[in-house]
Amino acid sequence: MSNEVINVLITGAAGQIAYSLIFNVCKGDMFGLDQRIKLHLLDIPQMVDSLKGIVMEIQDGAYPLIADTVITADVKEAFTGVHYAILVGAMPRREGMERADLLKANAAIFKVQGKALAEHANKNVKVLVVGNPANTNALIAQVSANGIPKENFTCLTRLDQNRAKSQIALKAGVNVKDVHNVIIWGNHSSTQYPDYRCGYINLSTGKTPISTAIKDEKWLQGEFISTVQKRGAAVIAARKLSSAASAAKAITDHMHDWVLGTAEGEYVSMGVYSDGSYGVPEGLIFSFPVKCANGKYTIVQGLQMDDLSKNLINLTTEELVAEKTTALQFLSE
């Protein structure tokens, strides 16, 4: 077991997603089975007693990887010295709230957290934003965090990728572990583009393109895409609560692969700072296919685009540009 202890911050730590996520971290699913961790758990003041109960459960679980815990409602205390920041907490969209109102409320939150990262966190802190609208919240945090590399800011689209892989596996009648390189492009919203074209399935006959294994182009270009785009809303309709355990699993997958690396030839989807790849404007947090090694990601280059893909990527790009414009206006107020 490593003697080095890493400091890991989870915001919104008393919430549903965090309740599943915290124990994934404790078990070593995120950073490996020999990495000791000091957990920083942040929530609003009225939730601190709930955090105390979670720490009791961590203690009662006797997790050998947990070196220490910090529970706090103080931003400075929470962000001090953190190596990894998982920003789950955000203002939820309430009934009757316009999207602009949601962007304004969250711009204020993530401006504060971006500044806190710059002032108190480790200078190479790696940041994953989960709270929605995740792409634009991540951008606000990045813009507000002077001195921290922009490539250190990411947002979660791995849940969408996992949903897409699962739909392909169900349609093909295979185990989800045999489905590879399904991509999510763009925004973590209903405009996202789930892309099967570069994906393949490991069948008994060998590596098989998804379009060959599933001979149903109408489904692949229609129902598959819309099912993944609307899956979050479908979970809420059925459960009366948003996705929690599946979101925690996706957060764990995202951080694990970013820190420990992806398998050879494997693509994963991450919302990252656009460098102009695939015609996406620079300065957006946009979901791309990436490969990870040595704690860094690189955007997969050279993938071919058909007309459908170009159109769907343009749609989600337009939405992100509009979100960015609105959010930055609020920042300047």
Swiss-Prot record:
It catalyses: (S)-malate + NAD(+) = oxaloacetate + NADH + H(+). The keyword NAD applies. InterPro entries: L-lactate/malate_DH (IPR001557), Lactate/malate_DH_C (IPR022383), Lactate/malate_DH_N (IPR001236), Lactate_DH/Glyco_Ohase_4_C (IPR015955), Malate_DH_AS (IPR001252), Malate_DH_NAD-dep_euk (IPR011274), Malate_DH_type2 (IPR010945), NAD(P)-bd_dom_sf (IPR036291). Keywords: NAD, Oxidoreductase, Tricarboxylic acid cycle. Coiled coil: none annotated. Its EC number is 1.1.1.37. Pfam families: Ldh_1_C, Ldh_1_N. GO terms for biological process: malate metabolic process; NADH metabolic process; oxaloacetate metabolic process; tricarboxylic acid cycle. GO terms for molecular function: L-malate dehydrogenase (NAD+) activity. Substrate binds at R93, R99, N132, R163. Homodimer. Catalyzes the reversible oxidation of malate to oxaloacetate. Belongs to the LDH/MDH superfamily. MDH type 2 family. This is Probable malate dehydrogenase 3. The lineage of its organism: Eukaryota, Amoebozoa, Evosea, Eumycetozoa, Dictyostelia. The gene is mdhC.
